[in-house]
């Protein structure tokens, strides 16, 4: 007689999903891994209260349409998440369940039900914008007599010039900036996608004056942030 094949439990599958699937096989970005981690932290906290059992006792078959629907409602109603954020959390759960179905086929019936649940539709509103005068007022708002004011001025000017997300701005380093006749900055976007954006002369000059990137700057680590949170 052949030995009975034992399927991995939920805890083992979740660990393998992060260490093997996301990090090793898919080479997911740290930002993606962090987002998925936060999703499951919220989900496990909710499931523990809902199922009245600790995360170590949760089984894969517990993650059914009833539990997932209640969790998504909890995100919107109790945590006041937007539909876009709610859908992002749901996408993380579905990604895990798709992997779990391959590793634990006996739970496919339950998993199939969750996978059949649709994403919630929402209105995609037009992006608002500021007038030229409003932008000038915003750029001139920081107090240049202070360290934080100088930093904020560079931050706003860079955002205006590049159209970068705040998360992308925070990750910009000294090594990403090129200051010469054709000044530019490299932006690290979602999904490990990089793009190079030209810098206007005014923006390049402000970065030089800020003191983090200068033609004859003292030795500063190329990995240093351009706009650090603190001094």
Language-model-detected regions and their locations in the chain:
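Conserved catalytic core of the tyrosine transesterase superfamily
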Residues: 1-231
